[in-house]
């Protein structure tokens, strides 16, 4: 909201947006909220991007076109990676326990 002092001696101002002419009062503070609104819109954009990142079907905020499903693919490969190593560790433990239980398997 922008104001123009029409007559500073008698404290008359005009609101540019509405064209309203009124008396300026000392107990009312006029603050420009446009910079605050811009920051709020920027934070809302980042909040929406964070919310979209929780859904694996959406693309990341700063990515090239056609990158939909990258979170889904990444989650799939992460599961395969950790599943492989967990399976290998269980297989090694079972092998060690089998050898300890039956030493005739290795010729002792």
From Swiss-Prot:
Associated pathway: One-carbon metabolism; methanogenesis from CO(2); methyl-coenzyme M from 5,10-methylene-5,6,7,8-tetrahydromethanopterin: step 2/2
Membrane topology category: Single-pass membrane protein
Domain of life the protein comes from: Archaea
Catalytic activity annotation: 5-methyl-5,6,7,8-tetrahydromethanopterin + coenzyme M + 2 Na(+)(in) = 5,6,7,8-tetrahydromethanopterin + methyl-coenzyme M + 2 Na(+)(out)
Cellular compartments annotated: Cell membrane
Swiss-Prot/TrEMBL keywords: Cell membrane, Membrane, Methanogenesis, Methyltransferase, One-carbon metabolism, Transferase, Translocase, Transmembrane, Transmembrane helix
EC supergroup of this enzyme: translocase
Main location per the UniProt record: membrane
UniProt EC number: 7.2.1.4
Bilayer-spanning residue ranges: 79-99
Pfam families reported for this sequence: MtrB
Entry keyword annotation includes Transmembrane: yes
GO MF assignments: tetrahydromethanopterin S-methyltransferase activity
Protein role: Part of a complex that catalyzes the formation of methyl-coenzyme M and tetrahydromethanopterin from coenzyme M and methyl-tetrahydromethanopterin. This is an energy-conserving, sodium-ion translocating step.
Annotated family: Belongs to the MtrB family.
Protein name: Tetrahydromethanopterin S-methyltransferase subunit B
The organism of origin for this protein: Methanococcus vannielii (strain ATCC 35089 / DSM 1224 / JCM 13029 / OCM 148 / SB)
């Amino acid at each position: 909201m922008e104001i123009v002092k029409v007559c500073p001696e008698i404290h008359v101002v005009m609101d540019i947006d509405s064209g309203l002419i009124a008396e300026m009062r000392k107990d009312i503070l006029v603050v420009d909220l446009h910079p605050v609104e811009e920051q709020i819109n920027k934070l809302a954009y980042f909040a929406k991007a964070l919310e979209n990142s929780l859904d694996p079907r959406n693309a990341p905020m700063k990515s090239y076109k056609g990158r939909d499903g990258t979170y889904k693919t990444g989650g799939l490969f992460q599961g395969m990676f950790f599943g492989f190593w967990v399976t290998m560790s269980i297989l090694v433990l079972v092998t060690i326990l089998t050898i300890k239980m039956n030493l005739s398997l290795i010729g002792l």
